[in-house]
Amino acid sequence: MDRAEAFEAALKLAPGKTALVVVDMQRAFLDPGEAMEVPPARDIVSQIHTLLDLFREKRLPVVFTEFTYSEDVPVLAGLLHPEHRRAAPGAPRGFGRPSSSCLRGEANVHVVPELASQPGELVVTKHYYDGFNGTALDSALRARGVTHLVLTGTMTDICVLATAVGGMNREYRMTVVEDGTATLWPEIQRATLDIIRRAYGRVLTARQIADEIGRW
C-alpha cells in the first residue's frame, strides 16, 4: 500500500462523524480595502457555500472560527501583525499600520454575511492561528461524536494549516478542500497543500467531497 492509499484508507470521511470547519472567512480578510485583505478568499465563497448547504442537508455539524485580537489578551500575533492593533481616530489604516483588523468589537471580526452561521452551529472565537489552541473546539467536537474534519477557509498557509496540524495532533482525520481554501500567493497555496498531503491529511476538491458525502 502506497502513501496515497494509506491516507485514503485512514482518512476517508465517516457518515455521522464528519464536521465542516470554516476557518476565518471574516470581513477583515474578505472586504475590499481592509488592511489584511485576502482577495483570493472571495473566490472560494461559492465552494464553501455549496459545502455548507450539503452538510446542513445531511444534518452534519458545522463550525466557524473567527480570529479575534483583544487588547485584554495581547498575544504575539498583535506584535507580529500590527494591523490587529487598534487604529487611532483619524489615523491612516493599511498594511503594516494599526488598523483594528479582527479586533474584538469591530464589525470586521465576523464571518462575511454570505457564509453566516445558522442557529445551533458552533462559532469559535480564537486568539491563535490554530482553532484548537485555547478554545473549546476539541471538547465541542467530541461531544458531537466527530472524528473527521473537512477544512475550508483562509489563510491556507497560516490558520488553515495550523488548524489542520492541531486537529491531526488530536487524532482527528483531516481533509482540506483544495478549492475551498485561499491565501495571497498561488505558489504558497500549492506548497501548503503539498505539505498537508505529505503528512497531515487528504486534499480534495469541493466536488470530490460532495460526491463522497452525497453517497451517504
Outline where the language-model segments fall:
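Short acidic-hydrophobic, aromatic-tinged amphipathic segments that line or gate anion-handling sites
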Residues: V124, R202-I209
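Glycine-centered short loops/turns at secondary-structure junctions
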Residues: E57-L60, G145, E171
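Short glycine/serine/threonine-rich phosphate/pyrophosphate-binding segments
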Residues: T156-T163
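A short glycine-rich beta-strand->turn/loop micro-motif centered on a GG-aromatic cluster
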Residues: H148-T154, E171-P186
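Active-site acidic carboxylates
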Residues: M1-Q118, Y200, E212-W216
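Short, hinge-like loop/turn segments at secondary-structure boundaries
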Residues: L79-E83, M168-N169, T192-I195
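Active-site-proximal loop->helix
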Residues: T163-V165, T183-R197
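Internal catalytic-core helix/loop-beta-alpha segment
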Residues: S101-V150
